[in-house]
Amino acid sequence: MKKAVQICGLVLAMCLAPAAFAQTSVTLTGVSGQSYDGIYVSPYYANVGGTSTVVVCDDFADESNLGSTWSAQTTSFSNVNSSNTSWGLAGANTALYGAVGYLTNLVLGAAPGSTTQVIDTFALWAVFDPNGVEQYLAAHPITSGSLTTAQLCSAIFGSSSCTGSAVKGSLLWIAENSGFTAAQWGMTVLSADIPGTSQLCTAEKGNCPAQEFIYLSVAEGGAAAAYLLLAGLCCGGAIFLRSKRQLASRSIA
């Protein structure tokens, strides 16, 4: 991701409840403005099927371009399986969407621009791609400031060296080992189609025109509503919501 952002307009409405499974058009319209280690963190703003929506990213391996439009399939958390999300197709354990829901909730509940929100975002990326997160942070260490790489790694993995595996009591361990289920979260997975087809792309395989995103299935107040009020800060320009491995010039598996 780049750091060039311009304020340009006003976003209007909350997302409405979608069908359990449906195809839709998505345009990525903005970022929350917070970046860490050269990368913008969640939440982001998108137009999903004509509705302005706050979205959170759970995909560290692929990339999304601000202003780009793509076809995607929406799947409610209660209907997630191995064939209807990009991570499911990649062979990921779909039970981990319970952890994704927990961390998405933390991202949206954290103070905008806070170190807590940075930690929650990177922990969410680490659910399906812990090694990718570890490799990027190891290659781009931050040694000073309000949140060093060692502090971030300690919060996510329980180890300042960012081992890629979660120690008991760490944020990632709590998310994955507290019995959270996908069905308990009122959220929807937004998985991109392979360009020119109605076939879902597979995360980490290089055929995704955008990352996988998560959004609230039902319009509700609190943090998500606050973010939509802030979403008047639409963004323009060539900003990338990128995989850290790509920014580090590493190839994608």
Language-model region placement:
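Bacterial N-terminal signal peptides that target proteins for export
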Residues: M1-C8
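Cleavable N-terminal signal peptides
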Residues: G9-L10, A20
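C-terminal membrane-anchoring or membrane-association module
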Residues: G236-A253
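A short, hydrophobic C-terminal helix/tail in secreted or cell-surface proteins
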Residues: A219-L241
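Sec/Tat signal peptide C-region and signal peptidase I cleavage site
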Residues: L16-A22
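Short, surface-exposed polybasic-aromatic patches that bind anionic ligands, especially phosphate groups
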Residues: Q23-L216
